[in-house]
Amino acid sequence: MVSVISTFSPFPLPEPMRQALLQAESAANQGEVPVGAVVTFQGKIIAVAGNAMQPPFVDPTGHAEVRALRQAASVLGSSRLDQCDLWVTLEPCAMCAGAIATARIRRLYYGADDPKGGAVLSGVRLFFQPSCHHQPEIYNDLGSRRASELLRQFFKQKRK
């Protein structure tokens, strides 16, 4: 059974989500969709990443979540990240949700919902499928206001 806990709060954000938002801002400054991700292990940040899909990267898998998971696996020397938590500014897509399940992330914290491309509580709801082999604890709505604003600003600029 997957547990989903909405964490909307007017209180200060935890440091990992603040760092994820900084990564999202950095990605936007590089012309990338503003998404940032952080992996923590035993409460310490071990990996940070923003989206990196555009030149010079040209990587269709260059989503912040995948990049942060790769870094964390490298730091820990294992692809099994079952004692790690992932903090991301936007609801993960199907590809990223699959990577989260494969890495066996313990807890997923995310900011803004993504009704069009998300796959956690939107779309295919990957972790709720019988074929999903791992289901992290899910905490949504953490830093959603700032994450949503970054996305709105980015796409408003793109449409100009």
PLM features: residue spans?
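Immediate flanking context of iron-sulfur cluster ligation sites
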Residues: S78-L90
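Zinc-dependent deaminase
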Residues: M1-Q30, P92-K160
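Short loop/turn microsegments at loop-to-beta-strand junctions
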Residues: V33-V35, C84
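Residues that line or immediately flank small-molecule/substrate-binding pockets and catalytic motifs
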Residues: Q42, V88, A112
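Glycine/small-residue-rich phosphate/adenosyl-binding loop
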Residues: A47-V48, E65-S74
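Short beta-strand scaffold segments in enzyme catalytic cores
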Residues: V35-G43, A47
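A short, polar/charged loop-to-alpha-helix boundary motif
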Residues: Q54-V66
